[in-house]
Amino acid sequence: MIYFDNAASTAVHPEVVKEMIPYFDTQYGNPSSIHQFGRKAKNAIEKARKQVAALIGAEPNEILFTSGGTESNNTILYGIPKSQGPKFVLNHIITSSIEHDAILEPCRDLEKNGVKVTYLAVDEHGHVNPDDIINSINPQTVIVSIMFANNEVGTIQPIKEISEICKKYQIPLHTDAVQAVGKVPINV
């Protein structure tokens, strides 16, 4: 059998397994502890944080580790609107109609609780028109969430242009870049 869905899930590279085995076997200390095992674990995490930061053009202190893409997406999509307190139901989110379910499901759930969500249409190539983002922004818009790369159709969104729009309007931009990291250059 040949597996063609490595963008969604893939085997761990043998070199990575080799590097990780000590942390599953002999160096399993709590990184928050001050003992030797804890310090070694903390050093390994900080090394990984620096490597991830370098990969995406970030600072190490900007990197937060989660269990995966879905948890990261949920943290942002639920966190930003709910950070507004009881007024969170007045919030507005802009996303695209072709997002991964890890984005669409939280948006649908937030809609059930009163949050307004605009689902932008895409063109025949799967691209979001940045002008549609501008036209959808309103005073209640708290976040724009557009995937960087679509793993089903291969579309790369104009994230740089979308980022500039979000900066201009002072609206946080969230991009699920799981499908893009390691395949196209990323500089946050």
Regions found by a protein language model. Give the residues of each.
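Pyridoxal 5′-phosphate
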Residues: 1-188
